[in-house]
Amino acid sequence: TTHSCQYAMAAILKAANEGRINILDGVREYAERAHAMKELFTKYGFEIVYDRDLEEPIADGFYFTIIYPGFTGGDLTKEILYYGISAIPLRDTGSKKQGLRACVSQTELNRMPELEERLKRFAADHTK
């Protein structure tokens, strides 16, 4: 039943409020990955689609959004697959904007050099 989940969540939040656990420790690595990946994507010509929520900068987390000039989200999804990079079109998430949602969970920090090489090749093939 849902009561079990609610009790578990209440216990986690209580422990966090009492200082017995730090609930951010488990997700900090995702922020580091997102930050590193965003730097690489923007270095090679990609733009961040959603960088603010109202007036506040969006924190680095489990995913981020990108677009490459001249592409729709669907076309970019297909094109980056040729370079061994995957993401989903923003339209599949309900967005009206063109772009991709890139998830950081499967890309560990030790794979950033590999990602950079792939992005470098993509940019070289698509720079006008």
Q: Which residue stretches match the model-derived regions?
A:
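PLP-dependent class I/II
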Residues: 1-128
